[in-house]
């Protein structure tokens, strides 16, 4: 057999194998609330709060790291969780990209910490007007440094990889703080977790100790588009932090954060 033909056959087999490993969106939403599936597939965001009696893992995607974490955290008696799910069609500009090129775009979007700066949330107290949530954001040289570093950028999409970086995020409620951001990359999933590496304070009052907040963004590549699940978990704290000045509603505060992170991701991949 012609050597060139053999090479093409091998490449074809590898391509078919890679594509067959990518799930359909319909294969990973077996627990999703049936009444919300149609609107979810049209791009609506579904939000769940454990303190409202919602089973948050229900809106995470089957067989994913996000699902495993949602189940684990939901079942922890000393935590409360809140999550959201949305579906994002691949941008038209990605039509000519290979699977690996699309995956690389997603990875580098989630690595681009500096682009979080300026993302907004809708403030109901300000008359449903947008307000800046993160006024500053950048990658740090390491977790024990205050020195700003360039955003990390991968040159190729690994099939499987773990990576950690430190970041500085300044938000409208807790001010400037260090966070550790971990990335777990698998064949068709990029799982990003953000954990506070410093105490979170509201004015002069400590709202959360180091490590008590964990947020995640789980991007799952499907044949039809990107299934996105975001989760916030608060460990060992009451839902409301009371101070002599005012009360801080943590579920509301962190739903704003994961909603803003979702909006940031959607905006960045569509640029």
Protein language model regions, located:
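Positively charged n-region of N-terminal signal peptides that target proteins for export
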Residues: 1-4
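Long, compositionally biased interface segments
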Residues: 218-220, 225-271
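Bacterial N-terminal signal peptides
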Residues: 8-17
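Hydrophobic/aromatic beta-strand elements that line small-molecule binding cavities or substrate pockets
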Residues: 178-185, 214-221
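Generic short beta-strand segments
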Residues: 186, 193-200, 232-234
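Amphipathic hydrophobic-ligand
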Residues: 175, 207-215
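Flexible, membrane-facing loop/turn or short amphipathic-helix motifs
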Residues: 200-207, 240-245
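Hydrophobic ligand-binding cavity/cleft-lining segments
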Residues: 23-172
């Amino acid at each position: 057999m012609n050597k060139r033909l053999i090479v093409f056959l091998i490449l074809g087999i590898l391509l078919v194998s890679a594509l067959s490993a990518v799930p359909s969106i319909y294969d990973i939403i077996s627990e999703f609330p049936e009444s919300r599936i149609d609107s979810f597939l049209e791009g609506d965001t579904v939000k769940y709060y454990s303190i409202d009696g919602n089973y948050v893992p229900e809106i995470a995607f089957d067989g994913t790291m996000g699902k495993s974490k949602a189940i684990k955290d939901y079942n922890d008696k000393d935590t409360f969780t809140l999550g959201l799910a949305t579906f994002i069609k691949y941008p038209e500009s990605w039509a000519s990209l290979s699977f690996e090129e699309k995956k690389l775009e997603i990875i580098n979007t989630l690595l681009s910490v500096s682009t979080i700066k300026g993302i907004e949330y809708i403030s109901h107290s300000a008359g449903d007007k947008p307000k800046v949530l993160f006024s500053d954001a950048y990658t740090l040289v390491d977790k024990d440094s205050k020195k700003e570093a360039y955003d990390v950028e991968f040159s190729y999409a690994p099939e499987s990889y773990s990576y950690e970086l430190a970041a500085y995020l300044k938000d409208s409620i807790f001010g400037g703080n260090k966070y550790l951001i971990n990335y777990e990359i698998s064949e068709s999933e990029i799982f990003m977790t953000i954990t506070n590496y410093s105490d979170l304070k509201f004015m002069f009052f400590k709202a959360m100790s180091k490590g008590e907040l964990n947020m995640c963004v789980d991007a799952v590549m499907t044949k039809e588009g990107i299934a996105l699940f975001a989760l916030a978990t608060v460990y060992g704290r009451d839902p409301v932090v009371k101070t002599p000045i005012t009360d801080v509603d943590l579920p509301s505060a962190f739903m704003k954060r994961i909603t803003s992170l979702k909006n940031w991701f959607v905006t960045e991949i569509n640029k």
